[in-house]
């Protein structure tokens, strides 16, 4: 990981300093492009007064969570709010809804959100109820068996979270067909979309 911290170019009083800071973007993009797979490069512009507010950004870019994020420019500005964060459970107290949570990518997303402290509501079609129950039980989540393509699904989701709140939605549900577009029937295409 290459993480370059610089000053916000527009806030530099001297044109030479501003130019040098602006060049960091090109440098990190070039590094990001030339490095081999598995390596990343970012620049974080830190405005004066925000030096004590970069921890979450630095932690993210130095973690495995940023493995596919490279050659990005992030700006950190001062803020009056400094929330206390439990870095072992950064999503503690949050509620997440993951659609398509009974297996595959949805299950993995539910695992990560739960690992990070969120209560995960696992949603999938009723036909996947057994797998959905298994995932929810393993991660300490809850189940919402529902076909999100049904006309009543939006209202059922609203009703489920009414008075409870919802902080995170990961809409992962989908249907894949191992066919080329030319070989798909209109019905198969409709399911995918």
Model regions and ranges:
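Helix N-cap/beta-alpha junction loops of NAD(P)-dependent oxidoreductase domains
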Residues: 11, 176-180
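The beta1-alpha1 cofactor-binding region of Rossmann-like NAD(H)/NADP(H)-dependent oxidoreductases
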Residues: 144-156, 186
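Rossmann-fold scaffold of SDR-type NAD(P)-dependent oxidoreductases
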Residues: 3-6, 42-45, 99, 166-174
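Canonical Rossmann dinucleotide-binding motif of NAD(H)/NADP(H)-dependent dehydrogenases/reductases
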Residues: 88-121
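Glycine-rich nucleotide cofactor-binding loops and adjacent beta-alpha elements
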Residues: 1-90
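Substrate-binding pocket helix/loop in short-chain dehydrogenase/reductase
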Residues: 180-181, 188-189
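Conserved glycine-rich Rossmann-like NAD(P)H-binding loop of the short-chain dehydrogenase/reductase
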Residues: 118-134
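Cofactor-binding loops of NAD(P)H-dependent oxidoreductases
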Residues: 46, 144-146, 179
């Amino acid at each position: 990981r290459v993480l370059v911290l610089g000053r916000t170019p527009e806030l530099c009083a001297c044109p030479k300093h501003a130019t040098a800071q602006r060049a960091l973007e090109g440098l990190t993009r070039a590094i990001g492009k030339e490095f081999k797979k598995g390596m990343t490069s970012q620049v974080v512009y830190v405005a004066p007064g925000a030096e004590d507010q970069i921890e979450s950004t630095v932690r993210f870019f130095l973690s495995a969570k940023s493995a596919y994020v490279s050659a990005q420019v992030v700006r950190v500005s001062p803020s009056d709010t400094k929330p206390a964060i439990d870095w072992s459970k950064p999503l503690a107290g949050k509620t997440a809804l993951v659609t398509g949570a009974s297996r595959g990518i949805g299950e993995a997303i539910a695992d990560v959100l739960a690992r990070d402290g969120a209560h995960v509501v696992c949603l999938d079609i009723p036909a996947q109820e057994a797998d959905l129950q298994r995932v929810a039980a393993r991660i300490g989540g809850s189940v919402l068996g529902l076909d999100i393509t049904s006309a009543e699904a939006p209202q059922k989701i609203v009703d489920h979270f009414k008075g409870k709140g919802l902080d995170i939605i990961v809409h992962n549900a989908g249907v894949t067909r191992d066919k080329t577009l030319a070989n798909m029937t209109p019905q198969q295409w409709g399911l995918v979309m």
